[in-house]
UniProtKB/Swiss-Prot annotation:
Motif mapping: 'HIGH' region: 59-68
UniProt organism field: Burkholderia pseudomallei (strain K96243)
Gene name in the database record: tyrS
Phylogenetic lineage: Bacteria, Pseudomonadati, Pseudomonadota, Betaproteobacteria, Burkholderiales
Stored InterPro entries: aa-tRNA-synth_I_CS, aa-tRNA-synth_Ic, Rossmann-like_a/b/a_fold, S4_RNA-bd, S4_RNA-bd_sf, Tyr-tRNA-ligase, Tyr-tRNA-ligase_bac-type, Tyr-tRNA-ligase_bac_2
Designated name of the protein: Tyrosine--tRNA ligase
HAMAP family linked to this entry: Tyr_tRNA_synth_type2 (MF_02007)
Ranges in coiled-coil conformation: none
Amino acid sequence: MSTDPTSKPAFPITDEVRHALAVTKRGVDELLIEEEFAQKLAKSAATDKPLRIKLGLDPTAPDIHLGHTVVLNKMRQLQDLGHTVIFLIGDFTSLIGDPSGRNATRPPLTREQIESNAKTYFEQAALVLDREKTEIRYNSEWSMPLGADGMIKLASRYTVARMLEREDFTKRFQGGIPISIHEFLYPLMQGYDSVALNADLELGGTDQKFNLLVGRELQKQYGQEQQCILTMPLLEGLDGVEKMSKSKGNYVGISEKPTDMFGKLMSISDVLMWRYFELLSFRSLDEIARFRGEAEGGRNPRDFKVMLAQEIVARFHSQADAERALEDFNHRAKGGVPDDIPAVTLAGAPLAIGQLLKQAGLVPSTSEALRNIEQGGVKIDGATVSDKALKVDAGEFVVQVGKRRFARVTLTA
């Protein structure tokens, strides 16, 4: 079927359609092709038939962080406009491993890892999406039955030259870095998902653009109306430099405790705060612009950071949790010890300070403990520890690492 708008009857672009298009475009990096999507929206409004909106996520890790919610928020906005959202769990494509943005082959996950991670994926995503209006699918439904014959036929629809147009593949090829054949299959399988689901729009991060376009091309080859493409920006992590990633430690998990989530959000820079407002807040753009004007006019940016942190904590927990998190944050800022810190009993006194911090669960390793001591970030009963060779005697005390990690330690011989 041709996707040339001139070959199909044009549907009227009403105020309702213009509003839906404006909602769709908020905060996006790119919408391809906007004129086509406007017609899809117009047709949907005229025929009262919802669009099929696809988002695929590979369960490569068990937890979803705020970076993932940028695209989930957009899905919810489209859902609220009345469209069908398809939350696609890439249990088959996870066996391949997405090479997007990689400079080396990504190790595929085992079936056991995938199944374990997938269990918690939608439960967390449902904190953003409307569970009752979400279609949950697994791409193994249609990918596994393909078999060798079907896979060969699918592979014949795309050339190696086209695959090498992708920037990360090009860099690896030119740099003599190996590219495995199975990595070429990933964009094809993701694209085939769009054929199987007959998607009208597919969402993804900016690093997914090539894969999304493969889906559009395959739909054309299979005689379907081509999906439009919507890419969302990658959210910077707490450091404001690299994209949010659990492996980089610069993330905020959506299942974290309210106090931890609030504290992490309050740690971001004033500049990064506005980026988070744009991509994570449900407030109107006009309201955010007004906040920014007030900050530029002299109002303390901390006021707006508190609003942002409370909004996000309330979304994933409750308004009461957000209020308590603010109280806890203010208490800590004044040098107070939180009421809900964990109690830990350790043995082996006198115990090296690095071991104590690790065994108390305050740091992942002794080397991390020593780094925190060097930076003046470790306190025992409020006194800063400066001696990395310190041996801690038996007793009861409160240990603090950084601004947010506390433990009430009982150390015995």
